[in-house]
Amino acid sequence: MDNLGHRENGRQRPDQYKGLHTQWMMPQTQRHLKDHQSMNLLALMNDRDNAIRERDHALAEKKAAIAERDMAFTQRDAAMAERNAAVVERDNALAALELARTNGLNMNNGNGFPQGSLSGSKNIHHHDQLSHAQSSPLQLADSPYDHAREMHISEAYPISTAPGSAGKAKRPKKNSSQASPLKRPSGVLRKTKKPSGDWKNVGMSGCGDDSAHASVMKNEWKDQNLGLNQVAFDDSTMPAPACSCTGKLRQCYKWGNGGWQSSCCTMNISMYPLPVMPNKRHARMGGRKMSGGAFTKLLSRLAAEGHDLSTPVDLKDHWAKHGTNRYITIR
């Protein structure tokens, strides 16, 4: 047949048809691969959308947290401002209390009277007591000039004065013998001492009630606390005193009745601890000392000057100038 191949080329037609058909008809395996890729793409897009939504949610939470943080900062600033105002008020109150305390130290126990006026009145009362207490001894001493009192005493008690006069009459005979010149001063002394004893007897016999009253008043005056602002040491509220002669505060030891002894210095050396005595076991050199009365006076003076007694008192410049005991045991 002709070249069109209706019969002769009958075998080639199926091949041409087959070749043309394979261009448009995909194999089954390729179709499955393409579907798998599209499914993967869809899954990736879904994951991306989920990630974007999570990011947006996280950003929203972050913004809310930032807003809460700013609110907390605002509250913190307000609290700090209130605290600063409270601190200022506290400082003002402490300053007012300190001023009132210093003014109270200059007053007599807060009675509203100046210290000078009350101390003056106290001194006047003290002088009155002293004058009353010493009135009878002064009158006895000035009795040669008070003839009326001498006559009154001699008339009231003639029996007590009679032996004295008899003794006076006999003594000139002993002095006129002049046994030795060395005995003469002793006789003179006895002669001068005897009238004083007679005057004592007269005073005690004639003014017994006055002298007893004067002695009682004198004892009461001794027992009184003469210091208006005297401060006594209290272990419960005041710390023990210390000494800073070595450059650091070292607590002192108790000594005697209310006194204190240094633990780091003597009259010649200053070191802590004090050296051990070579000729006495378990004993160190004795430090400088301060008696209880001197320490009480020091506390009173420091309190009057406005010193804070809640802190340890430095005794570096207040020790006694006298020597110390040779040994003291510190264990």
Swiss-Prot record:
The keyword Protein transport does not apply. Residues 43-101 form a coiled coil. Disulfide bonds: none annotated. Keywords: Coiled coil, DNA-binding, Nucleus, Transcription, Transcription regulation. GO terms for cellular component: nucleus. Residues 104-122 have a biased composition (Polar residues). InterPro entries: GAGA-bd_tscrpt_act. It is found in: Nucleus. It holds the Pfam family GAGA_bind. Residues 51-86 are annotated as: Alanine-zipper. Residues 104-140, 156-205 are annotated as: Disordered. One of its GO terms (biological process) is response to ethylene. GO terms for molecular function: DNA-binding transcription factor activity; sequence-specific DNA binding. Transcriptional regulator that specifically binds to GA-rich elements (GAGA-repeats) present in regulatory sequences of genes involved in developmental processes. Homodimer. Heterodimer. Alanine-zipper domain is involved in homo- or hetero-dimerization via electrostatic interaction. Belongs to the BBR/BPC family. This is Barley B recombinant-like protein D. It comes from Oryza sativa subsp. japonica.
